[in-house]
Amino acid sequence: MRILVVSLLFPLPTNVARGTFVSDNVKLLESMGHEIKVVNPLPRMLKYQESSRSTLTGVARAPKQFTHGDTEVITPRFWGLPGHPYPSITIRSMKRITKKVQSWLGEWRPEIIICHTIWPAGDLASRLAKQMGIPWVGIVHGHDFDVGLKDKNTSGQIIRLVNQCDHLVTVSSRLHSIAKELGKTASSLISCHTAVEDEWLTKPKKWQGRWRKSKLDILFPADPRRREKNHFLALQTGEELENRGWIVGITTLRQQPRTIVWDRMLVADLTLITSKRESGPLVA
């Protein structure tokens, strides 16, 4: 099957840790014999603006086209102000780049579109699906519902796109319930919770050190600049452990591939996942 994946997040040549959850999905689909192409719409921005968020690193000077592994990727640019105070600007921009994407695809025609994240990538996916006469599937990882629905500027657009997609995949039971509240029918909802691999189900090893005045290596497996990861709570935890007599060292991970994150989690004495938005074992 020919599948077009549309996503606001995807690994870039200078930021391979970006959008690893989408890259994992693409690899899985390719391993099953499907033919995949990726559209990763990027906001227009200057280099200094990348510092506002780790997922924006590499966006300003990203190439228009590149290959990630064996997958062809196009990165059309859209206009959008921070916080999307005027969604209509972004919508008009998505309408313009729809033609660019179709031109890039040429004679290659997908049979279905899978869209990771709803706003604003879902608007592009919806337009492409309508023009090609094919279904599109939206996937909600958390941000669209947890943050987007609370924003008066984007909530209406997210609700519109949720009801436009043919099927909606949610990665947790909580997000599944929110989708139902938005009017999505049970027949069009797919609940796909992230599985915990067998290696994480091993029993905790017996502690060999002293319970007091011994060094404890704590891993915060995410970029502290991402506010939703709640790095401050991890620091407070370390401070409390020090008050109780431990010698604490906290290590953070910035823009690391998931394989490295997993390896570090396996060797750390303690891994702290303090984010309230995680729906499965780790998006670093």
Feature map (PLM): residue ranges:
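A conserved catalytic-core segment of Leloir-type glycosyltransferases
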Residues: 38-108
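Short alpha-helical donor nucleotide-sugar binding micro-motif in glycosyltransferases
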Residues: 263-268
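N-terminal subdomain of nucleotide-sugar transferases
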Residues: 1-61, 65-67
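Donor nucleotide-sugar binding/catalytic pocket of nucleotide-sugar-dependent glycosyltransferases
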Residues: 37-40, 158-203
